[in-house]
């Protein structure tokens, strides 16, 4: 399982390259860089977003989703402020719960590390959503 708390994006890129069996020459041509520069990127814990976007396109994998999962699991609880102005930034409604996140949460319940209510409160997952996961993936019985 991925470590969503401590993200080392260079290592994840390296793993994805190994999975896809992509040639280093192709990567160097895509980035217009040397093999040493590619190896240096593997060692980076963080990369600039424009570089990460290129990696996502080249490897056909959404590396940004890893950071989204981190926000779901570890961001502080949102404070309700009715006086706050609406953001000019787009508001996304796309389903951001990947199978890895669902498995991570269900595993915490299955091992009694957390109760269903604790999961709902800590990760702000709607109760109906959690119970649908439990039913759909039938790893644990809904009570």
Model feature map: region roles:
Residues 1-20, 88-90, 95-111:
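A short, Lys/Arg-rich alpha-helix, primarily the initiator
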Residues 22, 50, 113-114:
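Residue-level signal for the short linker/turn that defines the boundary of a DNA-recognition helix
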Residues 67-96, 113:
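Short, charged recognition helix plus adjacent turn
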Residues 31-47, 136:
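Recognition helix of helix-turn-helix/homeodomain-like DNA-binding domains
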Residues 50-66:
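DNA major-groove recognition helix of helix-turn-helix/homeodomain DNA-binding modules
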Residues 23-28, 117-123:
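Short alpha-helical "recognition helix" segments of helix-turn-helix
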